[in-house]
Regions:
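Acidic, metal-coordinating helix/loop segments flanking the phosphotransfer/catalytic sites
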Residues: 33-51
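Short amphipathic alpha-helix used as the core "switch/output" element in two-component signaling
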Residues: 64-75
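Alpha4 helix (beta4-alpha4-beta5 surface) of REC/receiver domains from two-component response regulators
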Residues: 65, 86-101
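Two-component/phosphorelay signaling modules centered on CheY-like receiver
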Residues: 14-32, 119
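The feature encodes the CheY-like receiver
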Residues: 17, 59, 87
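C-terminal output helix
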Residues: 89, 107-117
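Active-site residues of response regulator receiver
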Residues: 52-55, 83
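Acidic catalytic/metal-coordinating carboxylates
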Residues: 35-36, 62-65
Length: 123
């Protein structure tokens, strides 16, 4: 039996988290949402996490800091950044650290789903 992938959303925008939850569940994913990097880390990320959708600007620890910490403590969880603040330097930094994609808010559903599909492909 094939497990349904778990997509974790870390974004402080409740409305966006709820919208992503609805979209991702509608196409068959399991979804878990967190309002901050700290809340996500306190929940102790599991190996079940197939992909992380992550905002850059978060209260407390930002998305790039979370990406760095996860690389040290949890190996490689595929990360897709979704942000309203994607400048070239931030985009380059995220991609150099292993992000699958950096998408700008608002991002078309098709672009997001394509990025998730790419993140879930075996490497």
């Amino acid at each position: 039996m094939c497990r349904v992938p778990l997509i974790v959303v870390v974004d402080d925008d409740d409305a966006l988290r709820n919208s992503l939850d609805d979209l991702l569940q509608s196409v068959g994913f399991r979804v878990q949402g967190f309002a901050s990097a700290e809340a996500f880390l306190q929940a102790q990320p599991t190996p079940e996490t197939a992909c992380l959708l992550l905002d850059v600007r978060l209260p407390g620890m930002n998305g790039l800091e979370l990406q760095r910490q996860l690389g040290v403590t949890h190996g490689r969880i595929p990360i897709i950044f979704i942000t309203a603040y994607a400048d070239d330097a931030m985009r380059a930094q995220a991609l150099a650290a292993g992000a699958v994609a950096v998408l700008s808010k608002p991002c078309p559903e098709e672009d997001l789903l394509n990025a998730i599909e790419a993140a879930l492909m075996p490497s």
